[in-house]
Amino acid sequence: MQIVNISAYKFVSLDDIETLRPAMRERCEAAGLKGTILLAPEGINLFLAGPREAIDGFMAWLHADARFADIAPKESLSENQPFKRMLVRAKKEIITMKMPLIRPEAGRAPSVRPADLKRWLDQGHDDEGRPVVMLDTRNDFEVAVGTFENAVEYDIAKFSEFPDAVAAHKAELDGKTVVSFCTGGIRCEKAAIHMQEVGIERVYQLEGGILKYFEEVGGSHYRGDCFVFDYRTALNPSLEPAGPKQCFACRAVVTPEQQQSPHYVVGKSCPHCIGGKDRAAA
């Protein structure tokens, strides 16, 4: 049976989490869905997988709530269920930055559609002639799997390090059009709002993140694959599972070449473990 995988998020003020949480868990469990839903005062972030009918039924139920009516999930297909259980969690933030909470009612940062971004990158500047800086907001191990050509990345181990990294390099972004990007949009949206708040004038978020860019325009101006947080580890620009795998022991990304090492034992170890590099994803 083919499994539909969806991911979606929205920054929206929620003050009824204690009611939403059991209702969502009951709905998902009744439909046989598995995955994780995060609820916080600043919004919702979800990753679900299951049969098409069950996914469509849940989304119809979710859309009946006016706060979530415009959520458009990103989809992919798999032969296997990537999640082991169904979790609905209440959190302080739907993506951890450890900064003052996003205020959804204040609005989101401007976004740039994948097709428009491709045009900017093709021509070497935005529509007003300013240079474009592609700013990768992801963790270092994700960037190592693939990123945009000439992208700026701050070698951060977790997203909560992003504000300090931006503060240290803020002057380098002056006078340029900054496009923040991430896997599916949630981190680059929060990052873009933060950059606006600290005085960076021309900031955009890549609408839908790297995966939406792959879906709409392919891999133009992108090098490598895109790390994803499930059993597939990485997707290529055709949104197909790629070669890199994640080590279950240390969570490092293992390239196809590294998988040939005698130190790579599925589920047990990899060259990173043996070499002492044990950085957990956060």
Swiss-Prot record:
Top-level enzyme category: oxidoreductase
SMART domains: RHOD
Alphabetized UniProt keyword annotations: Oxidoreductase, tRNA processing
Record-annotated active site: 182 (cysteine persulfide intermediate)
Claim: Oxidoreductase is one of the keywords in the record: yes
Domain Rhodanese: 128-222
Biological processes, Gene Ontology terms: tRNA modification
Pfam families membership: Rhodanese, UPF0176_N
Catalytic reaction list: uridine(34) in tRNA + AH2 + O2 = 5-hydroxyuridine(34) in tRNA + A + H2O
Enzyme Commission number(s): 1.14.-.-
GO molecular function: oxidoreductase activity, acting on paired donors, with incorporation or reduction of molecular oxygen
PANTHER family: RHODANESE-LIKE DOMAIN-CONTAINING PROTEIN 7-RELATED (PTHR43268:SF3), THIOSULFATE SULFURTRANSFERASE/RHODANESE-LIKE DOMAIN-CONTAINING PROTEIN 2 (PTHR43268)
Protein function: Catalyzes oxygen-dependent 5-hydroxyuridine (ho5U) modification at position 34 in tRNAs.
Family (UniProt): Belongs to the TrhO family.
Name of the featured protein: tRNA uridine(34) hydroxylase
Name of the coding gene: trhO
